[in-house]
Amino acid sequence: MTLTLNRQLLTSRQILVAFSGGLDSTVLLHQLVQWRTENPGGALRAIHVHHGLSANADAWVTHCENVCQQWQVPLVVERVQLAQEGLGIEAQARQARYQAFARTLLPGEVLVTAQHLDDQCETFLLALKRGSGPAGLSAMAEVSEFAGTRLIRPLLARTRGELAQWALAHGLRWIEDESNQDDSYDRNFLRLRVVPLLQQRWPHFAETTARSAALCAEQESLLDELLADDLAHCQSPQGTLQIVPMLAMSDARRAAIIRRWLAGQNAPMPSRDALVRIWQEVALAREDASPCLRLGAFEIRRYQSQLWWIKSVTGQSENIVPWQTWLQPLELPAGQGSVQLNAGGDIRPPRADEAVSVRFKAPGLLHIVGRNGGRKLKKIWQELGVPPWLRDTTPLLFYGETLIAAAGGFVTQEGVAEGENGISFVWQRNA
């Protein structure tokens, strides 16, 4: 068996390979070492993710270090901790792995993983069990976008048996994860109990399943093409989804548009029930309502006849964050990012006797630059078109008890720079 590298892989000279130390990734790394020999300008690194789920996890790290040392491949070991609630162990481990991959990738590097034909078959069956449509039944693509670069699966057309033959023929050593024998996990149940039975009855079942997945991917790609104009018409420059153009659409067409909009936000693919709730409970909620549908760590909200996909954040209206060293950036609570004061702008610097702080609400009537008369903060937010969920999380700059400016919003008359070197109040949000 030889590894036929995807042509898109050959355009990249920098590769990061996911290396668990198991059979599949060991064969992949072995063949990529050969690729490096044939392409002297190519750079190859490996990453091993230590989940801490097995008593053997430290021994696996040692094994991977020894293999990479033997093959002269730089190895990055990422230790991750899984959350104690929310997703199941399988989903948590996968999420943690791919977050580690994204953190480790260097500019210009592509990620290469060792999924093979049997994995593709299992992925298809899992999607079928969940009741997925063409997008889910497309299973895994040989090349896909990931973390601003590409994720490539060059073994996707090869069976697990072929990889085992290669490993034995070349005297490779690999680890066996004992959890792979635990059929309480859905994927293991399919691998150990279901797929062997199907393969016994239909020897080419994995190949035909992969063909069906490819046809689903083709249909999904065609839908993307046919709906591109509709999506562009419904989507605003800010990335929100306008409700009015979708009112006259059929249910199926509207659901397809919402799915593609969410995919563009890197959101998890919603179930059919979730799509119905997005439309009925959020888009069509009473005009005076502020509807919100939680989907994991994110929310779908409606504002100004548009759907918004936002990260869930706890309101900060009661928080006061002192900023004693205001020449340095200030970390905000609840993962809201950071703020800093930069040279150049319309805001006056604080006087020596003024304590600087960041707050998230301001009482009384406020007089802001560009507006006549005083207004309450709620009215200012409405006039500026600030969505309700941002109104108690947007950082407000205070000198003493005086509101000076809102990040990205306004400057008060008490905070305007006059005949002096002004500064700007910049909010750097977390992704």
From Swiss-Prot:
Q: What is this protein called?
A: tRNA(Ile)-lysidine synthase
* UniProt-listed Enzyme Commission number(s): 6.3.4.19
Query: What does UniProt list as this organism's lineage?
Result: Bacteria, Pseudomonadati, Pseudomonadota, Gammaproteobacteria, Enterobacterales
Q: Which GO terms describe its biological process?
A: tRNA modification
**Which Pfam families does the record match to this protein?**
ATP_bind_3 (PF01171), TilS (PF09179), TilS_C (PF11734)
Q: Which UniProt keywords apply?
A: ATP-binding, Cytoplasm, Ligase, Nucleotide-binding, tRNA processing
InterPro entries assigned to the protein according to its UniProt record, in alphabetical order: Lysidine-tRNA-synth_C (IPR012796), Rossmann-like_a/b/a_fold (IPR014729), TilS/TtcA_N (IPR011063), tRNA_Ile_lys_synt (IPR012094), tRNA_Ile_lys_synt_N (IPR012795), tRNA_Ile_lys_synt_subst-bd (IPR015262)
Which terms in the GO cellular component ontology are assigned?
cytoplasm
Q: Where does ATP bind?
A: 20-25
